[in-house]
């Protein structure tokens, strides 16, 4: 108990001597820093906690240096921290160790340097797309062209329509039967072989036709052949080609549109046999013109007559 009292007395005496060794201006700095105990995270009057705060020592030193130019800031600091352990943060940070009769110097310099670099890169690409179609109706040749240029982003549609006239050769075999019938002007019914009719096809000469009439001799009779029509139908194919269209876009963009057209056209060919009249002898009623080679010879004889 007595020992505790003795320690307290010694501590109080030490504080009193420290207070007496500094000027009134320096004492004001010490009081202000003790009043800031709450800001330093310490309770009021907790000197042990204050000694553990480096900012407590910095505050005393800086305040004395600026507010009390006639006082030795290092001496004031060493006196104020003389009750703190030598390894406390307030002492070691400020270099305030040693006896009160000594002088200590401490310097605090801080330099901050910062460098930063920023780089920005941007890349952009332009794409161009184009589609082209060429359609051909009928068959023939035509051209469809489309072009487009763009910068950055290019988008377009090139449409080429290829139309043309079918140019082709219609080939085929005409199959048809040419038959001719003729009526007598005298009222007698008669049928001729269709002499003078021209057509292309099988049985074009009317071979095998049967003639009969009321006027067997048919002398001076005028016969009229009906129109003989043979229709030949063939299909022809042509092609239509559309020119390619191209498109180039600055940035990056390219496209190719190709137009092509194809079609088919139907062509028909017809032949018409002209009307013909013949005067001469016609086979008697009931006579039948022979078929095959004999019929052809008989027909030729009639034409000559």
UniProtKB/Swiss-Prot annotation:
The record's keywords, sorted A to Z, are:
Cell membrane, Cell wall, Disulfide bond, Glycoprotein, GPI-anchor, Heme, Iron, Lipoprotein, Membrane, Metal-binding, Phosphoprotein, Secreted, Signal
Query: What protein name does the entry list?
Result: GPI-anchored hemophore cfmA
- Composition bias of kind Gly residues appears in 95-149
What intrachain disulfides are recorded? 25-68, 29-63, 42-49, 51-84
Please outline how this chain is modified post-translation. The GPI-like anchor contains a phosphoceramide lipid group. The GPI-anchor is attached to the protein in the endoplasmic reticulum and serves to target the protein to the cell surface. There, the glucosamine-inositol phospholipid moiety is cleaved off and the GPI-modified mannoprotein is covalently attached via its lipidless GPI glycan remnant to the 1,6-beta-glucan of the outer cell wall layer.
Sequence ranges assigned to domain CFEM in this UniProt record:
19-111
Origin superkingdom: Eukaryota
Which InterPro entries would you find in this protein's record? CFEM_domain, Extracellular_membr_CFEM_dom
Q: What happens when the gene is disrupted?
A: Increases susceptibility towards the chitin/beta-glucan-microfibril destabilizing compounds Congo red and calcofluor white.
Q: Which gene encodes it?
A: cfmA
Q: Which PROSITE patterns match?
A: CFEM
Residue ranges annotated as propeptide in the record: 277-305
What is recorded about the domains?
The CFEM domain is involved in heme-binding and contains 8 cysteines and is found in proteins from several pathogenic fungi, including both human and plant pathogens. The CFEM domain adopts a novel helical-basket fold that consists of six alpha-helices, and is uniquely stabilized by four disulfide bonds formed by its 8 signature cysteines.
Q: Where is the composition biased (Low complexity)?
A: 150-186, 196-259, 267-287
The species this protein was found in: Aspergillus fumigatus (strain ATCC MYA-4609 / CBS 101355 / FGSC A1100 / Af293) (Neosartorya fumigata)
Can you quote a single GO CC term? fungal-type cell wall
Q: Would you indicate the residue range of the signal peptide? A: 1-18
Is the keyword Glycoprotein in the record?
A: yes
Query: Where, subcellularly, is it found?
Result: Secreted, Cell wall; Cell membrane
The membrane topology noted for this protein in its Swiss-Prot or TrEMBL record is: Lipid-anchor; GPI-anchor
Give positions of region: Disordered. Answer: 92-287
GO MF terms held by the record: metal ion binding
């Amino acid at each position: 108990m007595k020992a505790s009292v003795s320690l307290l007395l010694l501590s109080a005496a030490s504080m009193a001597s420290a207070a007496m060794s500094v000027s009134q201006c320096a004492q004001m700095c010490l009081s202000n820093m003790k009043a800031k105990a709450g800001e330093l995270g310490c309770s009021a009057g907790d000197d042990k906690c204050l000694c553990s705060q480096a900012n407590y020592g910095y505050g005393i030193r800086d305040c004395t240096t600026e507010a009390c130019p006639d006082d030795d800031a290092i001496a004031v600091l060493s006196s104020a921290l003389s009750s703190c352990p030598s390894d406390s943060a307030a002492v070691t940070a400020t270099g305030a160790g040693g006896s009160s009769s000594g002088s200590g110097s401490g310097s605090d310099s801080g330099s901050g340097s910062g460098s930063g670099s920023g780089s920005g890169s941007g890349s952009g690409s332009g794409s161009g797309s184009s589609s082209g179609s060429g359609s051909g109706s009928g068959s023939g040749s035509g051209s469809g062209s489309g072009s487009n240029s763009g910068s950055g982003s290019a988008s377009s549609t090139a449409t080429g329509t290829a139309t043309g006239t079918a140019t082709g050769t219609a080939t085929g075999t005409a199959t048809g039967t040419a038959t001719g019938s003729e009526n007598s002007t005298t009222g007698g019914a008669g049928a001729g072989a269709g002499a003078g009719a021209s057509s292309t096809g099988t049985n074009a000469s009317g071979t095998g036709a049967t003639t009969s009439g009321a006027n067997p001799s048919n002398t001076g009779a005028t016969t009229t052949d009906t129109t003989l029509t043979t229709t030949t139908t063939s299909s022809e194919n042509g092609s239509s080609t559309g020119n390619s269209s191209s498109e180039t876009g600055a940035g990056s963009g390219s496209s190719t549109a190709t137009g092509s057209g194809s079609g088919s056209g139907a062509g028909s060919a017809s032949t018409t046999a002209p009307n013909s009249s013949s005067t001469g002898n016609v086979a008697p009623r009931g006579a039948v013109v022979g078929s095959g080679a004999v019929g052809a010879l008989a027909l030729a004889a009639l034409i000559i007559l």
